Amino acid sequence: MKTKPSLWLMVIMLMFPQIVETIYSPVLGSIARSFSVSDAQAAQTLSVYFLAFALGVVIWGVLADKWGRRPTMLVGLLIYGSATFIAMQTDSFTILMLARVFSAFGIAVGSVVTQTILRDVFSGHELRKVFSLMGIGISISPVLGMLLGGQLAFAGGHQLVFLALFFIALVLFVYNLCQLPETQQVKPKIALGCLVARMFKDRQVLLSALLVALYNVALFSYYQLGAFIFSDLGLDAEQFGYSGIALGLGSLIGSFLNKRCLLNRCHSVRCFYWQHCY
C-alpha cells in the first residue's frame, strides 16, 4: 500500500518555487541601489536564477530515482535555505549572483520531486484531478509572491525578502523532515539517453515544451523588467507588487476551466483551447 503525503504539503511545495521567483522581482530596484550596480546587472540575478532552476529540474529528477524522494527533497531544501541565508548576509554582488544560482538549483527540487511523489501515489483520473488542484495553487502563487514581495521590498528592501524566504525554507525543511514519507516503491533503471532521444522524436512533447517555453519567456520577462518600468513611471515596489493580481487571474481562470473539463470529461483539444484563451 502506498503511503500518501499530505496534499496541502504537496500544494505548498509546488507553490513555493513560483513564489520564490515572483517575490524577488519587486526588490530588483533595491538590489541595484544597495550593490551600486546598473538595472541590467540587477536583472541578471533573475536570468541566472532561471538557468540554474532549469538545470536543477533535470538533476533532481534523476536523483529522486537514485536516492529516493524524501532525501532528495530534504537536500534540495537545505541547499536553498543555505544559499538564501548567504544572499541575505553578503555585501558582494558576485556572491549574491552565486547565491542566487545555488538557491534556484536547490528550490527546483520542490517542483520536480513533488510531481514525482504525486505520480507515485496517484494514477489515472485521480491523478488528473490532483494536478488540477495543484494548478490552482500554482496560479495563485504569482499573486502571493508579487504582493508579498512588494510589501517586503517597501518595508525593508531585499534583505527583508531574503529573511522571509529563509524562514519559510527553514519551516518547510523541518516539516518535510518530520512529515514527508518515502513514496518510492522500487528504484527503476532508466536509460536516460534513450529516454531523451524518444522525447525529442515525440512531436507532442516538443509542441508542449514549446508552449511552456513561450509562456515562461513572456511571464518572466515581465518579472525581470517590470520593476524598472514601474520605477521609471514614478511608481514604487509596493505598487508593482499589486500588478501580480492581473497576472495570476488568467492562470487561475485557466486552472478552474481545466478542473471543470476533467470533472465533465470534456474533449482534451477543446479544453486546451478554452484554457489558453486566458
Task: Name each model-derived stretch.
Residues V205-G244:
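Extracytoplasmic gate region of multi-pass secondary transporters
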Residues F166-Q185:
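C-terminal membrane-cytosol helix-exit motif in multi-pass small-molecule transporters
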Residues P5-D39, Y222-A227:
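Extracytoplasmic
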Residues S30, G61-V62, K66, Q151, ...:
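Membrane-interface helix termini in secondary transporters
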Residues A54-T94:
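Conserved MFS/SLC helix-loop-helix module at the cytosolic interface between two early adjacent transmembrane helices
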Residues A99-I140:
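Cytoplasmic helix-loop-helix junction between adjacent transmembrane helices
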Residues S47-W60, I245-L257:
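Central cavity-lining transmembrane alpha-helices of secondary-active solute carriers
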Residues P181-S208:
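Juxtamembrane intracellular "pre-TM" segments in multi-pass secondary transporters
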